[in-house]
């Protein structure tokens, strides 16, 4: 008997081509949704997309100066050139997260695993990206350098906590004081007052609520003890990041002869908050988040891969800061 050819191909577009095409789109959407929900930093910094190449540069300019021009004097004698510099951010390589789903185990399974796998693939890439960007903020502070003389360096504010950091009044009070000091320091370095972000752990967020001042309506705080979250404080948008100090993915496999990787500095292990303006760090995208499906007949399995090719780096040290417990 000849093989049946007129069966219904639910996953194929108009019954032709890839029989999994339509199924994959659903899975891809789930990965993208999971990535968007999990990332806490991606929308709060600069992103640049390139069509080709291994790196891109961001120009850095200093500040001009004003001079009084006496009668009969020449502007050429007073003019001071505005200093320039550049920051280069390299593509890190191809970052991947994948699953291998065998036919026999999927057939035996009594529940659907693909939805959860989609979530895990998206979250893996999101957490890696978040960790890398927060690490780059901290690395700019640790470097203690200026892009151009006079623009300013990263800010470290140390707060003494006798009993150690915890979900308590003292920790919350220390963070509020630290944010106020950071606000003053940044303003003195001409960091724009809008789009300032403070990344904290969930424990620090709870400590802020425990301090009461953060949710005190008399102080105009944008927070709620009912929901247990804080939106804005001292001019900073407050964002709780569970993986605050995790850093990026392991640097093994990154491009370059001796890549540094995106490792959160151990010196800041007691950081209460990592602060940054939107322009402090940047991501360069060569390949945005994509999903690839491959049939592995030799294994009788489906392989699903989420991937992107991006690079992360610091731009403006003067717009970075750490609030550190000691």
What would you call each of these model-derived segments?
Residues 1-87, 320-324:
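N-terminal "assembly arms/tails" that initiate or stabilize quaternary assembly
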Residues 2-8, 285-326:
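Extended, compositionally biased alpha-helical segments that mediate assembly or anchoring
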Residues 18, 22-34, 178-183, 272-274, ...:
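Short, Φ-rich (hydrophobic/aromatic) sequence segments
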Residues 58-60, 83-149, 153, 187-202, ...:
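Long, contiguous amphipathic alpha-helices that act as assembly "spine/axial" helices in icosahedral shell
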Residues 66-69, 100, 109, 207-210, ...:
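Short helix/loop capping segments that flank catalytic or ligand/cofactor-binding pockets
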Residues 146-226:
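Extended, solvent-exposed, turn-rich assembly/linker loops in the middle of proteins
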Residues 227-293:
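Glycine/small-residue-rich hydrophobic helix-like segments
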